[in-house]
A protein has these predicted regions:
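Cysteine-dependent PTP/DSP-like catalytic domain, specifically the C-terminal lobe
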Residues: 153-163, 168, 217-222, 226-229, ...
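Conserved proline-anchored active-site loop of SAM-dependent methyltransferases
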Residues: 110-128, 206, 414-428, 543
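Active-site-adjacent helix-turn-beta-strand microarchitecture at beta-sheet edges
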Residues: 247-384
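SAM-dependent methyltransferase catalytic-core segment centered on the flexible catalytic loop
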Residues: 111-189, 197, 238, 255-288, ...
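DnaQ-like (DEDDh/DEDDy) 3′-5′ exonuclease domain used for proofreading
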Residues: 1-116, 121-175, 333, 455, ...
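Phosphate/ATP-binding catalytic cores across multiple sugar-kinase/actin-like superfamilies
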Residues: 97-100, 104-107, 172-177, 183-184, ...
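Conserved helicase/translocase motor-coupling segment
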Residues: 545-564
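Signature of N6-adenine DNA methyltransferases within the class I
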Residues: 173, 186-187, 196-257
């Protein structure tokens, strides 16, 4: 029975609770909510009031996030072997992004620093309809979700008839965002573009998934054109990008100062250029009663006491408490200037702000960037004047998002699992720092009834490539990389990428078998994943599954003519014909090579006889009694 059969919508959450609160589970596996409340009672305030987001299919969406993918990862060996791609850390995945996210979680959980997505807006004209390939019956769904047969039938109807309702859009987005949350690093952030049609719903599901306290704001971007005025309303000239952090207390990174900003820093001392602002707090919460610990006397250059009195005459407060003020004085950050207050010339304190290392907090209103029309023209130029996309986000928009992402450093990963026109990949290549990207895009067949898609399909056919959306996205990356190199021959950024496709095996394998019948001679199909896709597919899928990622430097090791694959704590044996000489060679490698210590031996079960596997186990069992004291774990996979 496959593991997916026993999964429930809350399987991930239950696993987390079992790991951290084992005492709250009874012997039969049931969860004791009262014991859990008692455990938390002295640590948190338990609220009995609140609200939650509900929509048709929410539990179904959570179930989809829990079900493991059955796809395999097929490397594009011809593309990946090209010099510009062979050592690239960038990854492009062709496949359903739900499957792609599930594969990524096995290697990149909590490792992605920045996620940007531009999902379907569900406007009615963007082609969004909900469909999925899961083959649940109403009875199965009713049992898994603990709902009525009628509710189960309504959910299945949504999944099969190509609905574009709000519930369908929410059901589509919810599992993808659940998985995306688990990919984010603790100091990472996700940026999600949307327009007016679903922005309210997006805010609700993001609050539900990421936590309302982790919302870092909403970017309002001018698109450069106004739409929707025909309806009699105001129309729209903006779209939005919600920003959520993985955890609270993250700070958006600052932007470089503009020429206008730099004009403020027109003073200079031995520490460098600086601007200054008065020490007294201004604006809201500036009264003594608002900050009583920040109301105190300080000495001016003449030795007189100075209090934070507002020009209106009321007692105000300083910007900092006394201890911090004393440190500012010690560091020479306090500047005294003569000024006129209430008709009298007096000393007044200011705080210096030095230019070095200073940036500015970005505004949520972004009107200075070029709009979508120019972005579309730029992509058209890349394709020699051919318009292959109707709607494209500007590269500068994504670059600015990367720029303000918290705590970004070289080598960090940027993910876009609605890659589309591949603007995110283009932006990453143009950034000054060396980041890596992962793109995921469904290989949707381009629609010849849409002019730009028909043109794109013809373009791809002329260069001998399939007419799918992922292919035109990859071609955009290739052409952008060429242009970047032409403009800067000294660039050392990673401008290549490795390509992988997600494919569903056609045969029934042992790990997928739901029911065994010894009388069913047609139970097994003649081909295996190895026969259908080859060694590199099996190996790549396993490497990602075991946490090594898509670009792991695996080593092919020769064992008396038999090739095994070694990385980290794993030795993979996939091919057939594991003879005695090879088994002896594997054992001797363990015994004589001090750097060869894989604790896990993974075997492709179809390739070996019972005798071969037992012989290998017997030979390697003696390693636990030798100097290395290794106890080998055998993992037989199908």
């Amino acid at each position: 029975m496959t593991a997916n059969e026993s999964l429930a919508p809350n399987s991930q959450e239950i696993a987390i609770l079992k790991e951290h609160f084992p005492a709250c589970f009874n012997s039969d596996g049931s969860f004791d909510i009262e014991r859990f409340k008692d455990y938390l009672n002295d640590k948190v305030n338990i609220a009995n009031e609140g609200y939650e987001l509900r929509f048709l299919g929410k539990n179904y969406a959570r179930l989809l996030a829990s079900v493991d993918t059955t796809t395999v990862i097929v490397p594009d060996e011809e593309h990946n072997s090209k010099p510009e791609n062979a050592n690239s850390e960038n990854v492009y995945i062709s496949g359903d992004n739900l499957d792609g996210l599930k594969h990524l979680l096995k290697s990149y959980a909590k490792k992605v620093k920045c996620i940007y997505i531009d999902p379907p807006y569900n406007t009615g004209s963007d082609g969004f309809v909900y469909n999925d390939s899961y083959k649940f019956t109403a009875e199965e769904l009713s049992d898994k979700l603990s709902i009525s047969d009628e509710q189960a039938a309504r959910i299945l109807d949504l999944t099969k008839r190509g609905s574009a309702s709000h519930s369908a859009w929410l059901m589509f987005m919810y599992p993808r965002l659940l998985l995306a949350r688990d990919l984010l690093a603790d100091d990472g952030a996700i940026f999600i573009s949307i327009d007016d049609n679903e922005q309210a719903n997006l805010k609700l599901i993001c609050d539900d998934i990421f936590g309302e306290e982790n919302c870092m704001g909403c970017i309002c971007r001018s698109t450069g054109q106004t739409t929707g005025q025909d309806s009699g309303g105001l129309g729209s000239s903006f779209d939005y990008a919600f920003v959520y952090g993985r955890k609270p207390d993250l700070d958006i990174a600052g932007l470089p100062l503009t020429d206008h900003d730099l004009k403020r820093f027109d003073n200079e001392d031995s520490f460098g250029k600086y601007a200054y602002d008065q020490l007294r707090k201004t604006g809201s919460n500036d009264r003594r009663e608002d900050r009583p610990n920040m109301y105190y006397a300080i000495k001016d250059p003449d030795g007189n006491d100075v209090y934070p009195t507002a020009t209106a005459g009321y007692d105000s407060c300083w910007r900092v408490e006394r201890k911090t003020y004393d440190q500012l004085v010690a560091d020479d950050y306090i500047l005294w200037k003569k000024t006129t207050r209430n008709g009298e010339e007096v000393w007044w304190p200011y705080v210096k702000y030095y230019l070095e290392g200073r940036s500015k907090r970005p505004s949520p209103l972004w009107t200075e960037l070029d709009g979508n029309k120019k972005a579309t023209r730029e992509v058209r130029e890349l394709f020699g004047g051919v318009k292959v996309f109707d709607y494209v986000k500007p590269v500068e928009f994504i670059k600015k998002i990367i720029q303000i992402s918290p705590n970004m450093k070289e080598g960090d990963i940027i993910l876009d699992f609605f890659s589309g026109s591949a603007t995110t990949a283009h932006a990453v290549m143009e950034t000054e720092k060396k980041y890596h990207y992962i793109m995921v895009q469904l290989p949707a067949i381009l629609d010849e009834t849409v002019t730009s898609q028909k043109v794109a399909k013809e373009f791809l056919e002329n260069i001998g490539r399939p007419g799918t959306l992922d292919q035109i996205g990859m071609e955009r990356i290739i052409r952008a990389a060429i242009k970047i190199r032409e403009n800067n021959t000294e660039i050392t950024n990673d401008l290549g990428f490795r390509h992988y496709s997600l494919s569903e095996p056609s045969g029934i394998t042992l790990d997928k078998l739901e029911h065994f019948s010894p009388n069913d001679n047609g139970m097994f199909v003649s081909n295996t994943v190895l026969e259908e896709f080859g060694i590199t597919t099996v190996l790549t899928t396993w490497l990602v599954r075991d946490g090594y990622g898509f670009t792991a430097p695996v080593e092919a090791v020769d064992f008396a003519g038999y090739t095994g694959y070694y990385i980290g704590k794993h030795l993979y044996l996939i091919k057939q014909d594991l003879n005695n000489e090879a088994i002896v060679a594997i054992t001797e490698k363990y015994e004589t090579d001090g750097t060869f210590n894989p604790e896990n031996v993974v075997l492709f079960g179809y390739s070996f006889t019972w005798t071969e596997m037992e012989s290998l186990k017997t030979n390697l069992a003696r390693l636990k009694d030798m100097e290395k004291n290794l106890r080998i774990n055998f993992d037989i996979r199908y």
